[in-house]
Amino acid sequence: MTSLRPLRLLPVVVLMAAIAAPAAAQRDPLTARTKGNAQAPVTVYEMSDFQCPWCKRHSEQTFPTLEKEYIDTGKVRWIFVHFPIVSLHPNAVPAAPFAVCAGRSGKFWPAHDLLFRYQGIWGPLKNPAPYFLTLADSLKLERGVISRCAQDSTAVAEVRSDSEGSQRSGARSTPSFYVEGGLITGAVTVDVWRPILDSIYKAKSAKGK
């Protein structure tokens, strides 16, 4: 479902802390799932589910334009947050650790793109794990390494932490986006995104002068 709710004031530090907590002692788990300059004035957290059709729509139809206009130009830093909706999309649960493990080999975003591209194939499968290994082949990742990693408690904990942090931020559906104190829900179009990002960027840039 696509909708835009009024922006809600929520402390971004709470979301960041909740998501990063389990692996903070070893590494920042968000690094592999981040696009854009770390010093960009605007940060967007995308709370998403790889089996969600509206998330696929956002990824393939909206995000490429946002990346070109805002991320590549240094205005926005974009962070992907795992939020599998188990009751609706059970195969999103194993898909998320697969993406985490691809990220540990520096290939989160290519894995992200493949998962959404072939959602119609692996989504209905009773056991999608073997298909994820074919995606690992496409990414030139070692099957054994990915398989062991996907079952590792730290990968599962990373996804769980993301999901819990998303719920604490106020997200209840996917895709949802936490944008500098506001929550946007649904696969809203580029025409909706532009005035939101432009106004926040202008305000943040003015404060920095």
Where are these regions (language model features)?
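Sec/Tat signal peptide C-region and signal peptidase I cleavage site
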Residues: 21-25
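Structural alpha/beta surface segment adjacent to cysteine/selenocysteine redox centers
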Residues: 40, 48-137, 169, 199, ...
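Divalent metal-coordination and catalytic microenvironments
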Residues: 44, 111, 146
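N-terminal secretory signal peptides that target proteins for export/translocation
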Residues: 1-6
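Bacterial N-terminal signal peptides
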Residues: 8-20
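Short gly/ser/thr-rich secondary-structure transition/capping motifs
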Residues: 26-30, 157-160
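A short beta-strand-turn-helix
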Residues: 27-42, 70
